[in-house]
Amino acid sequence: MASSLAAQLAQIAATSTHQLDLKAQRAAHSQSLIFEKKIAGSQDFDTIFQVCHEGFQELCSLDSRFLSFRRNIFSDQSKTEDRGQMTTSQNKELDSVLEDFLSLVGARLLLTPAVKAVDWLIRRFRVHEYNTSFLLLTFLPYHTTPLFLNFLSILPEDLTQTFKVFLPYKRSMTLPPRQVIVQSASTNKSFFSALNNYVLQVSKSQAHYQGLVSFWAGITTEALANMLDSAKSGRMEIETRNKEDVLIRILPVLNDAFMLRKAPQLVVGCYMLCVVLANKASLEDHVLDNLMEAVTGSWTQTNFVSGITCLSVLSQQKHEKSLPSKVVKAVLRLDNVIEVFEELSGRYAVTGLIIGLIRSCVQENGKRSDPARIPFVGQLIQRAILSDSETIEALTILLQAFSDLQRQGLVADGMGKQLSDLLLQFNESDTLAPLLRKAIENAGVDITQLEMTLETVLQADIMPMEIEDADLLDFISSSQTQDAFAVALEPLSQAAITESSFLAPGSSLLFDQLAEAFIHGASTKDRVSRFIKLPVLRPDKPLDDPLYLSFFIRFFSGPYPVTARTVAISIVSSCITAMADKSADMQGILPYIISALADPSERVRREAAALLSLIDRLASKCKDNDDSNAQIWGRGCLYGQNERSESVQFLPMKDIYKIIHHALMPALEEYVLDPDQVGRTLTQVIRGPRSQDDSDRTRSESTGVEFKKPLRRDLFLFLCSHASKTALYTVKLRLLKFLNKVGKIGSLNCTEALRQVFDQWRLLSLEHLQRIEDGERISTNELEDQVLSIIYPKDMDAVDLLFSSLTSNSRSNRESFLTAGFNRLKEVWPSLEETHELSLANRLLQISLSLENGKLAGAAKGLLRSVDLSGPVILEFLNKISASVPDLGSRGPPSKKRRTSQNNMVPMSSMDKETDSVLQKMTFILELIDSSHSENHPELISGLFQTLTIIHHLKLQTRSEMSYLLSLNLGILLSIVNKWKGMPTRKINTSSIRADLIIDCVRTSESPQVQNTALLLVAGLATVAPELVLHSVMPIFTFMGSSVLRKDDEYSALVIDQTIDQVVPPLVQSLRNQKRDVVSGTSELLLSFTTAFEHIPSYRRLRLFEALITKLGPEDFLFAVFAMFANRYSMDKDVLATMTALASDCNAELQLITYARYLNLVKDTLQPKPTLAKTLLGVGSEDGRDPQKIAVDLLQALSHLLKFTSLRTKMSECFDSGTEQQVDKAHGLFSTILEQTLALSESVRTVKPVNSACGETLGTLLGTLSLVDFVDTIEVLLQRPSDDLRRKVIKLLENRLDSSNDRDKASQARVLSFLTVLINILETSPDILLKHAAVACIEKIGEKYGKKDPSQVLAAAKVISGEHCLGQPDRRIRVMGLLCLASMSEILGEGIIPTLPEALPRAIDLLRDTLAASDDDSQLHDAVYSLISALLIHVPWMISGEYLDNILQLSFISSNTDLAEGSDENRLEALQLLAKRVDVKEAFAGVERNWDSAVTQGSRAVQEALDVVRTAIEKHAKSATVKNVSVLMKLLCKAFDLRRLQLSPLNDGGFDEAEVDEIESRANDVAVRMIYKLNDTVFRPLFIDLTAWAVSGLGKKDTTGRVARLTTFYRFLESFFGTLKSIVTGYSSYIIESAVEVLKFSRCNDKATKTLWLAVLRMLRNSFGHDQDEFWQSPTHLASISEPLIKQLSMATNSPTLDLVAAEAIPTIVELAVAADSPDNHKELNTVIMKFMRAGHGNARGADNPYTRLAAVKCEQQLTERLGEEWLALLPEMLPYISELLEDDDENVEREVRRWVLSIEDILGEKLDDMLT
């Protein structure tokens, strides 16, 4: 409550307008852009308005839009407006007007009139405080100018977070650099938003200007780029979210700005922002489209060029290059847009935009399209804006669009007609026709149909055969191709036949020569015909000799151009067609046809499909032939004359027919479309229908046939034999791809069928592989994978074959084969049977741990880590750990002697090697177990605990932490236990669980990971097998308190939560089952947690203890936790905050139960033999704390809980809405607590600290009651005899009222009725302290509720005013009573008057006694002045006459008393209130009456009296001053006579001169302020009287008195002329005569008259200097004063007097010369001055004195410098004097004259040498 009140008061103070704080008001008034603070502070609003209105008028002449402000903020009425007195709605309207003006004036702030006008807003309307944001943003574009420094100086200190960046620059008064503003816009969201909103608001009002928009665009663009750069992140989702946040901030700004088309410069700035967004924000296409539409929707004829530039950048970032329709239409509507594109293309990348426009223009439907689009596209292309490649891209778009229109039949009219005309036009262009042909090739359109539609020829004739691939094009370049073919063919015509088949293994030079020739000749039929007739190919015997066909088979299966390979297949087809009548068996070609059907080229596949059809027709003719007589092509020689060809598998013709016709032919067209389809088909055919999955079966339905297993087996072997024998690795790869998918058919698997391929491949060298890759252009890695896929996973022999191939001769294996082999093992692993897996795993483990072959061991380890090991395998591995270290149990740690002895180095080393080996093995095995879903294998528990035992032994032996091994082992156990918890029915053998080992890990390990895992394991075991761990669980909590609880990471938090959730409940239940006290039994646990509190991260504390108490049971344990907290941490704020939060979560009943048990524990603490307190708090133990201190800490903590928890609220809810039983229980519990507290308080009455703590607890306990119940309780307690207790409860009520916000009528009435009880105490109690408490409480009641019933407060005020309070001799009760009356004055207002007859005299007497006393009683002094101030505020008319005189007299005495600084402030504040509030006549008369009393008390009293008069003049109307001017003049005369009276030789105890000077300065100030409020009619007679009083008021014999009075008078006149200036120059006529007289008799070297001499000269200087009415030009006035004044030069007779004359007299003479301003007058003055420049003139001593001549020269010099050529018009008269003075005997005179001459020459621009000769 207290903090809430403090916050409210702070908020009120922060927003206070300081209406009573004069200093603050003056400071606020002195804030100005054009005046210094001192000057600004002295100006009134009339003066300010006059200056500022001039600037406003000039602005109106510049811009008529300013004229509207004449009616409001620049009207005469505005001078009296005060924002502090306006309502909220009025201020809001004013804000709107001010912002409109600032928006308009922002463009002209560098002009003086604008600054003047803005200064009026600052001075009158305080825009720098009320409209700080708008004003700052108005000035911000000028942040590099001196104007901004002036602006910074007036900014308030409490800038919001939005503009906090400017605070350092305000304090250091330096200009903020641009980068700082950019950085703030980048990082400060509110500043960025404020800047954007300001610019938009100004632009909407049409007040924007170039400087503002440029500044905004530059800052915002850089800031946006910085924000987007900062949004980048390593995580894509975070970066996306960050960039979305930036877009959310900038897109609304762009949306609003684009709508302001009348602000084209602003729109261009938005284009810049769009460019930044496009380049940095990775926008999606739809966002870019919206931006592009916004850009085109915002541009005008003045800025569309910038818009097109922006569009070009946006279009580059799009993935889909077409543009929105609105964008295209907007571009087409622009004038001369083609020329703009031409101009921009040289500077910006507009290609993307142009291509997008072209694409979008041709995408419209032909019948609906805009007819202007196609001509626009034609112009874009024909203007050569695009490069050749870009033009080809554009033409390709046109061709594709035209092709689409062709298909739709829309080429006859509309867009189709326009496009056809445009294409014809391009075809006729010399520059575009070649590009159009290339575009035709790129577009892939049907050239023939296009030519027919356009009725023209689009490209020249090409070769007779269509050419598709780029490789072949390189060979067929017209005549070059003809020559190359001839050259290649010539040697082949005579070549000898050395080959039997080109499919034989090994390289063939002849084949390479033939292939080269065929490539060159494949382009024309003639060359092909010549080629196939080559004798070397044996074309005449294609059936008998495989050479002819084998060439073309190898060619179309090789890496050759597509067209050539297609021709090769067609030649084979032609050959077979020619042999159709010979019934030949051509099944030898079938594998190669299948390979061709899997070729990537569609043309090859299509030609191969045609070939397969021929084979099918041929097979249908031969299917019924006798196989024994059939002629099979290539049989025995297909792969050469060798064993390879003999072992090739062939099938009967009828089976071939079935395979081709029924299996392959139905899906023939699918093979052409999909190169993988033939493989899928054959896989399905061979595997049969039962082995197919649903998707395969669906695909195979098209074959419509199911072959029997023997046929499928034969087909499989047929294809496998060709895959094994063929030397073409491309064919081998394509066959293996589907053969490996077959896997097994019957008892035959692919490993058996393809073993030869595997064996051959394994032996190939790297060089051979490279030759394969280079020669056939295939991936050997892919081929290697297919070869290794031959290994059938379900055949252990096959797996063994692979394993032995990898390990038997591992060093000679290729690295790629090793890697691929282990990858294959990984693939087959899931298919292994358990026994096979176990065998293979053991062998791999052995290899992994071997040190012989690092690569092999690494591969084996990688395999074991990557596969999912089964339960038997990992159990076998785990058992190997214990089997490998059987004797470790007998080993202990080596003794220190053995460890340090040099003689034992060898044995130790050997032991280290053995240990290292064991550790490596253990580590690897545990890692494997950990990664193999060990949670599914509870059978591992026994072995894991054995391993844990081994690790502990190794720790002792090696003195190592073994953290990693322990973490692995415990982690595996934890995963098993966690799985066990989730399956309660699962049975696990718990006999092998060793809780002691886990606890040992917790206690001895230093690794947080090990500790946390062990704790989680204990928590898990406590849930599923509590009997195993509870007996040893306490050390865990001790450890947690010192370790885990202190960690600040999420994992540790999880550990703690699970430990609490799973260990604590069974532990408590176990204690209950044993019928032990649960609190005592868990004290160690509680101690661990409470001790660790300070180390627990703050954000986790509350959640942790909530969980702990919930699991323990709050009814039993909450009080214990609170007590242990309070005992250990006392009043630590963090602990108290946690306790408060914990208590607040409980209901009222639980809180009351907790506090009752808590108080019982406090009572037990103070017992001689404590019980529970000894266990929980250590009371009575040897190292325990003092029980009394413990009790104090506990009680203080309880007080805090009662004060800050929600008990009161929850009790109120219980009483209001609870059941009767709940209410009764709550009442009973509260009564018990109250009884306990009272009893405890009684029992510790003699122990002051504990008793004090009890009283505090009692008070806070009572604070939980409602105010009505609280007052009732207080009344009961006040009936007790103990005054100490009564004081406390009254103080409690006061505190309660101080923090209470009870405003209900019942509470108010009850508290006000309590005043009678307090009055009774005042009247009857002899205890002063009790009375003091009662008065304080009365004051608080009056302050809170007094206005509800003033009569009751008045009754109390009367008692306080009387003898029972103010009449008491005790100082404290008097002070309290006076302060209470001051407070009541505010409450009662005029109602306080009945108390004044008794109160005010007593107060004045008390003040008089205090001032008369020898000791300093500042408190009573201040209290009296507090009452006086309150009365002056609320009933000022009661302070008059005698009361006023007493107050003034005592105040004068107080000023002469040595009091504290605060006391002086209180007195001065009261005097200021007196001046402001008391009737002005009474105030002036009172000061005048008591003037002598003030003088008697010293200068300070006089100064304060004058301050009262000055304030009264200031704060009251002019009429009040006019009416009381006579009294004021009397007072001023007294003040002006102080010098005469106080500095008189007859007055020994008077003021010193400094004090008199200060008093006169204040009196002058009072006089001037009085004069300001008088008019000339009133003041002139007064001035005449004052002059007469000063000049002739004293007798001529009183020389000293006259000098003193004249001195004061002329000092006043100096201020008078200096302040009022030209207004009062005419008053000089009244004092000329007196001034001349003074000049005649006063001397600067005479102490008695020196001050008067100085005053007269300074007065004259001010009068001369401010003459604007030509007063001193009058010969009469000038003549009377000039000569006496100039004669003062003669007083310069020595160095000191020369300095005085130079400092005072000469400047005055110069000012007179300036005021005289006439050649005649100047001549007259100069004549007199020159008299003092020549010896023999002047007074008795004349100018014979060099100092006099020097003074005259200095005077002439200053006149020359000041008046320049005007004065030098008298140069002819001065030249003789100058000549004489240049020869003067005195060096100083001569030197000064030379300076004067130089000054003259400077002005005239010529030398005086000729004139002086």
UniProtKB/Swiss-Prot annotation:
Query: Some GO term, biological process aspect, for this entry: which one?
Result: maturation of SSU-rRNA from tricistronic rRNA transcript (SSU-rRNA, 5.8S rRNA, LSU-rRNA)
Where is the protein localized? Nucleus, Nucleolus
Stored InterPro entries: ARM-like, ARM-type_fold, BP28_C_dom, HEAT_type_2, HEAT_Utp10/HEAT1, U3snoRNP10_N, UTP10
Instruction: Report the SS bond pairs.
Output: none
User: SUPFAM superfamilies in the record, alphabetically?
Assistant: ARM repeat
Pfam families assigned: BP28CT, HEAT_HEATR1, U3snoRNP10
Chief location of this protein? Answer: nucleus
**According to the UniProt entry, which residue ranges have a biased composition of type Basic and acidic residues?**
690-705
An example Gene Ontology molecular-function term? snoRNA binding
* Assigned keywords, A-Z: Nucleus, Repeat, Ribonucleoprotein, Ribosome biogenesis, rRNA processing
An example Gene Ontology cellular component term from the record? 90S preribosome
Q: Where are the HEAT repeats?
A: 245-283, 389-427, 428-464, 584-621, 659-695, 1058-1095, 1189-1228, 1265-1302, 1309-1347, 1398-1437, 1678-1715, 1769-1806
What residue ranges carry the coiled-coil annotation? none
Q: Where is this region: Disordered?
A: 686-705, 887-912
Its job: Involved in nucleolar processing of pre-18S ribosomal RNA. Involved in ribosome biosynthesis.
Q: How does it assemble?
A: Component of the ribosomal small subunit (SSU) processome.
What family does this chain come from, according to its entry?
A: Belongs to the HEATR1/UTP10 family.
Protein name, per record: U3 small nucleolar RNA-associated protein 10
What's the source species for this entry?
Answer: Coccidioides immitis (strain RS) (Valley fever fungus)
